[in-house]
């Protein structure tokens, strides 16, 4: 499973990139707001930091304006992935952009039927929002399993990009479901490496090593 960083903070992205953990980046209007920067500037910088897909979201809701905004975003870099909402206009724009061989990410997916339409529209990625589904009292991970089954049944090439990831358990369950990608906030991504038994075991080894009086380098 690939890891995308769900952030518009270039310092966080660079830190994770240096660790070799970044396969791509996703942004959205809320993350752009948090960055306090111009969208074109921040997306351009992110694209210079990572080689993988960088999702940049249109702000329009009608087809014509979506296409105009997509054209502006696509010019930023070759690794831009145009992010669109799963609406009828968004699906239409996705189909048109796919025919131009541009990468697309259909977002705000909350049902398997929406994911089916995303695949039919030729989306590169579909983004089911796991955490937000959990907030409604339904298991968001179940949606990942449903989409995986549908896509496998029909051989769709659209990749499942698990989004709205809140916890390390979400990441684990997304991996078990067969999701192709998980887009993860920096804090959660870094916490995947943490375990109290690892810390305890390392401390024991370091204490014993100190007693040997040896050096390796």
From Swiss-Prot:
Source species, domain of life: Bacteria
Keyword Cytoplasm listed: yes
Catalytic activity, as annotated: D-sedoheptulose 7-phosphate + D-glyceraldehyde 3-phosphate = D-erythrose 4-phosphate + beta-D-fructose 6-phosphate
Transmembrane regions listed in the UniProt entry: none
InterPro entries referenced in this protein's UniProt entry, alphabetically: Aldolase_TIM (IPR013785), TAL/FSA (IPR001585), Transaldolase_3B (IPR022999), Transaldolase_3B/F6P_aldolase (IPR004731), Transaldolase_AS (IPR018225), TSA/FSA_arc/bac (IPR033919)
Main location, first listed in the record: cytoplasm
Key words, A-Z: Cytoplasm, Pentose shunt, Schiff base, Transferase
E.C. numbers: 2.2.1.2
UniProt cross-references to PROSITE patterns, sorted A to Z: TRANSALDOLASE_1 (PS01054), TRANSALDOLASE_2 (PS00958)
Biological process (GO), any one: carbohydrate metabolic process
GO CC annotation: cytoplasm
UniProt pathway annotation: Carbohydrate degradation; pentose phosphate pathway; D-glyceraldehyde 3-phosphate and beta-D-fructose 6-phosphate from D-ribose 5-phosphate and D-xylulose 5-phosphate (non-oxidative stage): step 2/3
Subcellular location: Cytoplasm
Residues annotated as the enzyme's active site: 83
GO molecular function: aldehyde-lyase activity; transaldolase activity
S-S bonds: none
Function, in words: Transaldolase is important for the balance of metabolites in the pentose-phosphate pathway.
Family named by the database record: Belongs to the transaldolase family. Type 3B subfamily.
Protein name, entry field: Probable transaldolase
């Amino acid at each position: 499973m690939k890891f995308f960083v769900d952030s518009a903070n270039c310092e966080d992205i660079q830190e994770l990139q240096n660790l070799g953990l970044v396969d791509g980046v996703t942004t959205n209007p809320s993350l752009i707001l948090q960055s306090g920067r111009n969208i074109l500037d921040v997306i351009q910088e992110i694209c210079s930091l990572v080689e993988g897909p960088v999702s940049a979201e249109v702000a329009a809701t009608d087809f014509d304006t979506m296409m105009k905004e997509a054209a502006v975003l696509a010019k930023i870099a070759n690794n831009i992935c145009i992010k669109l909402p799963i609406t009828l206009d968004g699906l239409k724009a996705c189909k048109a952009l796919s025919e131009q061989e541009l990468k697309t990410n259909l977002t705000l997916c909350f049902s398997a039927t929406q994911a089916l339409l995303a695949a039919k529209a030729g989306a590169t990625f579909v983004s089911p929002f796991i955490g937000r589904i959990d907030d409604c009292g339904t298991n968001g991970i179940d949606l990942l399993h449903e989409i995986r089954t549908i896509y496998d049944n029909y051989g769709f090439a659209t990749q499942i990009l698990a989004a709205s990831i809140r916890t390390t358990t979400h990441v684990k369950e997304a991996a078990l479901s067969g999701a192709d990608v998980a887009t993860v906030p920096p804090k959660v991504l870094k916490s995947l490496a943490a375990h109290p038994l690892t810390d305890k075991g390392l401390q024991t080894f370091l204490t014993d090593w100190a007693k040997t009086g040896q050096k390796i380098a």
